[in-house]
Design a protein with these regions (language model features):
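Anion-binding (especially nucleotide phosphate/pyrophosphate-binding) glycine-rich loop
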Residues: 1-149
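Phosphate/pyrophosphate- and phosphate-bearing ligand-binding catalytic cores of soluble enzymes
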Residues: 4, 10-17, 54, 152-299, ...
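Beta-rich strand-turn-strand
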Residues: 107, 306-309
Length: 335
């Protein structure tokens, strides 16, 4: 395994912002990972996957680890029924290629998460979700290395502390995910859960798992920019949770506010709606703007400086705060 000094990270974040890593390496096994941790015990560490949910505003003064640990295997569990299928997938496998693998074999549970960029290892960190599904619903176990002790530890689903775009791995930043064990089903029945997807499938009486994947891909491609053409990180902000009273105040002026009741009396609303009504749909300042088809996505039209993105982000946050008294929280990681 080689180490690189002052390594350019532009190709390791989907916003394509420039930054140098003091040290960079790509371990291909857990043994190589242990070696790089042992070789640089006192360096600050950052583990990155596909770089689809982060960007850089400055150089990283430490060790950047971009693992290349791949592999997939089916595992058996005598206590489970024949309906169940378990797959252990290593962290560096491409997420959408894995979803395609499952759909081709009729393994149900991931089809709504089609075309999400990134790696398998990033999925539980962010608890990725789309079209009424979250990855936490199909994760049985996460195998990780504790970066402080170099020990391999396993987390059952309930130990991962999954939340909305959140997990113990995201909050603590002290674990390197080695693999994820998924619990899927061998049979599939479509359950309507999301308006756009339901509408896309309305002419199909009994959608197959492949029909659902194809529909998700079509909807995403219409709404979302290709990061290879227009650098972006997908949804930039989390959808906010507000009180019922707060929602009612907004609805008095904006009757079409999306409002989804949640446990504890809160209401989940749409960050895209708020950004749109605050005047930032399709808005561009210099080389940074929101995507015209989806204001939740910030796109980079040509800046190499991550601070340009931060300034634009802060403008949106202030506009939404002024109009709705809601503070938008970034979904992406900013370094």
């Amino acid at each position: 395994m080689d180490y690189y000094r002052q390594y350019q990270l532009k190709n390791y974040n989907s916003f394509k912002t420039e930054a140098l890593a003091k040290i960079f390496c790509q371990p291909k096994s857990t043994d190589e990972l242990r070696k790089c941790l042992a070789d640089y015990p006192n360096e600050k560490k950052l583990i990155i996957g596909g770089g689809c949910n982060l960007f850089f505003t400055k150089d990283f003064d430490g060790l950047v680890i971009c693992p290349d640990i791949k592999g997939l295997r089916e595992i058996s569990d005598e206590e489970e029924e024949d309906e169940d299928i378990f797959l252990e997938v290593n962290a560096s496998e491409n997420w959408d290629e894995f979803v395609d693998y499952c759909v081709e074999r009729g393994f149900a549970g991931l089809e709504n998460l089609s075309l999400i960029p990134g790696t398998v290892g990033a999925a539980p960190i962010q608890n990725i979700g789309a079209y009424g599904a979250e990855v936490k619903d199909v994760i049985r176990e996460v195998v990780a290395m504790d970066l402080e002790t170099n020990e391999v530890v396993s987390f059952a689903n309930n130990e991962c502390e999954f939340g909305y775009r959140d997990s113990i791995f995201k909050r603590t930043c002290k674990y390197f995910i080695i693999s994820v064990i998924f619990h899927l089903k061998r049979t599939f029945v479509y359950t309507p859960r999301y308006f756009d997807l339901n509408k896309e499938l309305e002419d199909i009486e009994e959608p197959s798992i492949q029909d659902v994947r194809n529909a998700v891909i079509r909807v995403r491609q219409r709404k979302l920019p290709d990061e290879k053409v227009l650098p972006n990180t997908g949804s930039f902000f989390k959808n906010p949770y507000i009180t019922r009273d707060h929602a009612d105040l907004i609805i008095a002026e904006y009757p079409d506010l999306p409002a989804y009741p949640q446990k504890g009396g809160l209401v989940k609303t749409s960050a895209a709606f708020l950004i749109d009504k605050a005047g930032y749909k399709g808005k561009r300042i210099g080389n940074i703007g929101t995507y015209p088809n989806q204001p939740l996505i910030i796109v980079n039209y040509g800046s190499a400086n991550g601070k340009d993105i931060v300034r634009f982000m802060q403008e949106i946050q202030q506009a939404v705060k002024d109009e709705f008294n809601i503070e938008l929280e970034p979904e992406v990681r900013i370094y």
